[in-house]
Amino acid sequence: MVSYRLFASGLPKGQHFTLWTWVLGSDPEAVADAFINPEGLIVNKLGDARHKEEPIDVRAVAGRGEKKRFAITSDDWTLQAFAEAVPFPIEQTVNGCHLWVEMSAPNYQGVVVRGSGFQPSESLTVDLASGAEGGKQQLNATPEGTYTAAILPSVKGKKSGKASVTISTPKCSVAVQFPWGDGSYRIQ
């Protein structure tokens, strides 16, 4: 289990907000009344001379590569702020090249692969494999030196398996591996 203490900037202090969480595969859920104290800390009760402030510590469980999403919204929805964190990332860094996977569908039936630290518009050799299926592609990094791809790792006739992504450039070769399908999701 991980715990997050949330802060906000650029929003009015002392105004009522609602704190939301969004678990993958379900609808967003309102979980608490929220206010922003003068320091930007999100609390469920503002302190005063007679009352102690009560910060909201969001506790969450997660699987590897699972994003936790939070939002605060004003009562009239004109003000909104969003945050996300991946408490247990599936990631690898080699020679400044960073590659990571975020679960985008339950049981890793869909993932988003992201990379950074590549040279602007650099040629990338991307090797995707899931079971005995896969292949290599020659692609280019973005002008910012990043890479993003959505992957559906399922293999016909299989209920589960392992997938891997390797990106190679002249300066680095970085790889990540992740399970998918039945039994792949495990709380850390």
Residue ranges and their predicted role:
Residues 1-188:
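Extracytoplasmic/secretory-pathway segments with low complexity and glycosylation-like composition
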